[in-house]
């Protein structure tokens, strides 16, 4: 059994890397581990909103992290401080047993039962992805195979993917479903080689009815893993078994992804999810508030929705901050109170986010050029290389899509951005001067302000 403190420190490090500073401080630093047994990890959180957020967004990552750290499969149980207080057994025991049943994962699949189509808020930015996911769930293996869902972090890709798994399982409880991240797949593959159990690994992944692989972009620099996944994909596809993949970008935009995998991924349907518009953000907040029995006026929800444009996770984090602020001050939630509660969040979320114009200004100043030079079409070396560096930095240091980067740097095509990124990456391995310039610019941008 692993040491609980060491395990929690490992999980904290993972969350610190994956979440925004605001998200980390809101969700992770306010939680603490209570007890670890051979099949359960109890985690205490401050309030019901935190609990709901953990159950929806974080428990999957806990399961993965515990397995990575200790090769132990556990079901996270998220409880508020009040729920952890001792009480008469006759009153509390049945409720706790019901909570355990409702909150834990379906052990066989690692699917979060809260990720369902009913709980998914549909908007302009995700309606096509939602429709495609529902079609796949209702008739797996017959249409849109594979289904490739792509987009930025916190926009609902994992929710849709797991909703497919949950609906398939509801319709057919005997279905063999495998949900993993690309990192899980790679780790399982490596372990199978080390333990000489490759055949067992292949049986586990190739005899499923539905394979769900999250964050497929991390296959990019893993040649042997790509080889293994190629054969796994072919076996499932030929047997008309459904494959669903998610990524932060299109298949042909994933660096170092084999062309034959790009071709396989493009066989089905690729659909994107984009940041929710204002109406959708308001609907998400109303849905969340109703689920938590929070009394919040419509104008206050509209105000909160207007402050957070990035993704659903940050949006829900903002609602939690407002609710906590209301509790602390013992005041009803109003627009004025929400504005006070979100002051720090607004500063972190907007001021701290690097933009493409900031990158262009820094690169232009560094190379003694103008921003217009970088956006222009001149092909002289003194401008081309800084322009490529700007594209490289925009790709590495922001969450903007390739088309967005190209558009803001003079209306270039997204393939130009890909070429620039690859060119600078390759040049940095042989040109020490260029490498030093890129590192210096990175530091300038990180320490801006």
Curated annotation (Swiss-Prot):
The entry's keywords: ATP-binding, Cytoplasm, DNA replication, DNA-binding, Lipid-binding, Nucleotide-binding
PROSITE patterns (UniProt xref): DNAA
Renumbered residue ranges of the record's region Domain III, AAA+ region: 110-326
InterPro entries for this protein: AAA+_ATPase, Chromosome_initiator_DnaA, Chromosome_initiator_DnaA-like, Chromosome_initiator_DnaA_CS, DnaA_C, DnaA_dom, DnaA_N_sf, P-loop_NTPase
Presence of keyword Isomerase: no
GO annotations of cellular component type: cytoplasm; plasma membrane
Chain positions covered by the region annotation Domain IV, binds dsDNA: 327-449
GO biological process, one term: DNA replication initiation
Segments for region (Domain II): 72-109
Protein location: Cytoplasm
Pfam families found in the cross-reference section: Bac_DnaA, Bac_DnaA_C
GO MF assignments: ATP binding; ATP hydrolysis activity; DNA replication origin binding; lipid binding
Region listing for Domain I, interacts with DnaA modulators, in residue ranges: 1-72
Binding locations of ATP: 154, 156-158
Family according to the record: Belongs to the DnaA family.
Complex formation: Oligomerizes as a right-handed, spiral filament on DNA at oriC.
UniProt comment concerning the protein's domains: Domain I is involved in oligomerization and binding regulators, domain II is flexibile and of varying length in different bacteria, domain III forms the AAA+ region, while domain IV binds dsDNA.
Described purpose of this protein according to its UniProt entry: Plays an essential role in the initiation and regulation of chromosomal replication. ATP-DnaA binds to the origin of replication (oriC) to initiate formation of the DNA replication initiation complex once per cell cycle. Binds the DnaA box (a 9 base pair repeat at the origin) and separates the double-stranded (ds)DNA. Forms a right-handed helical filament on oriC DNA; dsDNA binds to the exterior of the filament while single-stranded (ss)DNA is stabiized in the filament's interior.
Name of the protein: Chromosomal replication initiator protein DnaA
Organism: Lacticaseibacillus casei (strain BL23) (Lactobacillus casei)
Lineage of source species: Bacteria, Bacillati, Bacillota, Bacilli, Lactobacillales
Gene giving rise to this polypeptide: dnaA
